[in-house]
Amino acid sequence: MVVKRKLNCGGSNGFDFPNIPKAPRSSRRKVSGKRSDDESEICAIDLLASLAGKLLEESESSSTSTYASEADNLDHLGGLIKQELEDGYTTKPCKSEFFDPGNPASKSTSENTSVTCLPFSSFENDCILEQTPVSDCKRASGLKSLVGSITEETCVVNEDAGSEQGANTFSLKDPSQLHSQSPESVLLDGDVKLAPCTDQVPNDSFKGYRNHSKLVCRDDDENYCKYYKFSDKCKSYRPLSRVGNRRIMQSVRAISKLKCFEDTRTDGRLKALYRKRKLCYGYNPWKRETIHRKRRLSDKGLVVNYDGGLSSESVSNSPEKGESENGDFSAAKIGLLSKDSRVKFSIKSLRIPELVIEVPETATVGLLKRTVKEAVTALLGGGIRIGVLVQGKKVRDDNNTLSQTGLSCRENLGNLGFTLEPGLETLPVPLCSETPVLSLPTDSTKLSERSAASPALETGIPLPPQDEDYLINLGNSVENNDELVPHLSDIPADEQPSSDSRALVPVLALESDALALVPVNEKPKRTELSQRRTRRPFSVTEVEALVSAVEEVGTGRWRDVKLRSFENASHRTYVDLKDKWKTLVHTASISPQQRRGEPVPQELLDRVLGAHRYWTQHQMKQNGKHQVATTMVVEAGSSM
């Protein structure tokens, strides 16, 4: 197939530029490697170079009045090109034209633009982008050039074959304008001459506008995390390659995959752009450079430190340097997965044992303060213990961990409470009186004491504290009540407190020498209260002793049974003996299959039944005799 150009003369100004093939709509996608055999033919490079030179000379010397005649000459030259190409078809190769949308020169509509192909020397040769200025006749034909601040950029590329240096000079605005302006509004003066380069793209001068973002290809199995980087820079277009050099291109692709993180080749030349074509295709130019992670990191305890690079422990936000992002967290709000999990809480109040205060009515406030201070000092200085309450229940085992108890940073710590308890070796020394007084300090650092009146103080019976301790609530303290206030009726008018003070309990007049310290028994432990009720089954020996005592004494004298057979057994009460006898009677009256508990010999059960019948009948006789005697007494009284 021969490269053909069609020059159409006409239009509003009498001249039309040659049609330049446009890039396909799917240029962002991967260019198919299949091409027809017609496109792989080689053209006569020398002939095209000479014709291009003639066209350039004619275009420079032409004017707007001679455009029509030059159009006819171009048709003649087009036919001549076709004829000469057919003659040199089998001798020299020719590279097909292509359109590079990433090159601004391909977007211009300059007249008589032609493509020249030089003999292929090596697949390592880089392309040359060369532009030469043309006359201003094109601007008279209605075209517009770039307006604004223009910067000049020069790129020189070395050739291996001819050792030639080509200066690539062009004018360029902001690269974002290249996407917004149409080909009719963008003009870059000059013709373009391209050298054959199957591995390169003829826009090496646009290196500053390519996508050179590195994508880390390492992928760990433990932490699969990738990111995509979008770019708003100019997209590059890879031209179609020749069929004859497909093997060379495949070898270059294999080499480029190994050097995907390098910017230049080892020999110092520019790197082929198609190595990064996957970075350029498929992304919209208006998207910002953003990192999108495929996996969302959880904020419930998982902390990842970013130290650059992509691995199972880090993610880099930049191709060159990673930024560190340390995760901070609070142990009181989120659950931690580390072994150093800590539970943080604040103690607003403590429960203290009950303090009963006794003061005479004639005592001064200073004496009352000293008395309370001595009581509190005796409590705190004598040794105290700390109690822990979880959901209102006291935790008694000190060896349990916080997680076993139900306390962790993930749980609500509002269910946690503490109490102050007197030590085992000391007893609280409160002050007791017939009319105790309740003190409510307003300062948050002071303790509050609770008083309770009890008639047991007069008889000398020790006053046990209440079962429930009282919580010190800072918000419920009485304002302006820093001191204990006696009853207003017993205080002189000049010494009466202000109206906002409140008398809690009236204090009766007592002599000053009546002040005394009465120790109050320590609150009995639950274990001691329930120790007697612990189930202690009767042994066979105890059952035999019980049966013998009942046979002698009877079933109505359990205290005598206790003194006769269980005098030294302090854990056996007469009530226990009575309950056990009833159980034995019931066990003996049922079948052996229905019996539960420890087995009792059948001989003892028979004795139980015999004793039970005997004493039942004896009791009935006693009741009958008593009724007869009562009847006789009543009749004798009535006869009188």
Curated annotation (Swiss-Prot):
Impact reported for residue 607 to G: 60% decrease in telomere binding
Region (Disordered): 442-464
Coiled coil segments of this chain: none
Record-annotated Ubiquitin-like domain positions: 343-422
Annotated compartments: Nucleus
Top-rank taxon: Eukaryota
DNA-binding region: 558-585
Entry's Gene Ontology BP terms: telomere maintenance
UniProt xrefs under InterPro entries: Homeodomain-like_sf (IPR009057), Myb_dom (IPR017930), SANT/Myb (IPR001005), TRP_plant (IPR031105), Ubiquitin-like_dom (IPR000626)
Keyword Transcription part of the UniProt annotation: yes
Conditions for induction: By salt stress.
PANTHER family xref list: TELOMERE REPEAT-BINDING PROTEIN 4, TELOMERIC REPEAT BINDING PROTEIN
Protein name (database record): Telomere repeat-binding protein 4
The species this protein was found in: Arabidopsis thaliana (Mouse-ear cress)
